[in-house]
Amino acid sequence: MQKNITKISDTEQELEIILSAEEFGTEYNQELEEAKRTVQIKGFRKGHVPAGMIKKLVGPAIEASIAEKMASKHFSAIADEENIKPASRAAIESFSFDDNQLSIKLSYEIHPEFELKGFEGYTFTQPRYTITDEDVQKEINLILKGHGTLISIDDAASATDTVIGDVVKLNAEGEAEEGSAMENHHFNLEYLPEENPFRSALTGKKAGEIADVTTEPKDEETPAQIYRITVKEVKRLELPELTDELVKEISGQRFEHAADFTSDVRLQLEQHFTMKSEDELLESISAKLIEENPVSAPKTMIASFANMLVENAKRQMGGNFPKGFDAGQFEQAMAPNAEKHARWLLISQKIAEINNLSVTDDDIRAFAEKEAEKNPTLSVEEAISTYMSTEFRDYITDSILKDKVYDIIKSQVTITEEPTPIPVRQN
């Protein structure tokens, strides 16, 4: 067997495999004999069609089948011998049977070879979110909203109130357009964007007052729209007191006392923002290493990440994109992000390779024990059994390896903490 490897690009190669008749003859003759037994031609008894006629009729199909078998048989061995790291399945570009030899040309993508820049001198800032009593109370208030009562008030509307009013659309002369009236329209100001003209105009208004609202045109050809709102009522959400009885109802009997519920809210906030802090640090690290190591990513790998991002978006929208959604344009918009994911995977793999990182059964058991601690309904034995299973093992192994890679990076860079207030939640 002869083999010739041609570099097409940093991520693409071609492999030519040349086999002698002795190396593919057995398989070829087996398929030819099978064809002799099964091919039927008028005028010949089954199994007695001349070999020359068989070759003329089904020879091309046999040759294609043999080329596929020989490519599958030899590619993996050659990849191991030549230290090729395929990033895609090898595809047959062409093949030929000449002078008792078979030549097969394969194309495939590879993981590129590159030198990883040292990152020991890098410095990163990690936000350290501080949870205040006010933050805890705001979170509790959000929970209590589902148990609150809307009450009518005489005060001017605040940015969190609901304004009820009659709406008409005005024409250029300032007169009401026929058929445009809407009675008792509810404006929940809290859920309107701050720059929304209706929110701006209605904040500060009382029952009986009038507000004129001008909306910005969508384009130069569309005129601005003017609406007149006669405020009929302003309502404010009155929150209930956080009592032990209400806590039992809200928590499904998990907590009996308001103090315990409040402590749990604080704990949940602390855990959430600890994870957020870590995620933001890791995002900064990956962005820096991607910037400093402009490695080319295989198209197959980028396409895989693009598909993952699209499927994630579909799940967030209930399983499918809404009618009229331009999926093609969305995929194009996701392409740069998919390429970053692919490049970061290559960099992570390089760090793991340099540091001889691997994942053992003991690592998976330790991971399962930590996860079981977080979930009281999951026993350690169940977690270990699940994570060791064929269905989950690769995913868990990948997660653990990522953590090991990040630990290596964090041990060699400088990380400074910056006290940071938690961001205001957008309703």
From Swiss-Prot:
GO cellular component terms attached to this protein's record: cytoplasm
Main location: cytoplasm
EC number from the UniProt entry: 5.2.1.8
Catalytic activity: [protein]-peptidylproline (omega=180) = [protein]-peptidylproline (omega=0)
Main enzyme class: isomerase
Pfam families per record: Trigger_C, Trigger_N
Domain PPIase FKBP-type residues, every copy: 160-240
Subcellular location: Cytoplasm
GO MF: peptidyl-prolyl cis-trans isomerase activity
Family under the similarity heading: Belongs to the FKBP-type PPIase family. Tig subfamily.
Domain notes: Consists of 3 domains; the N-terminus binds the ribosome, the middle domain has PPIase activity, while the C-terminus has intrinsic chaperone activity on its own.
Name by which UniProt lists this protein: Trigger factor
Organism: Chlorobium limicola (strain DSM 245 / NBRC 103803 / 6330)
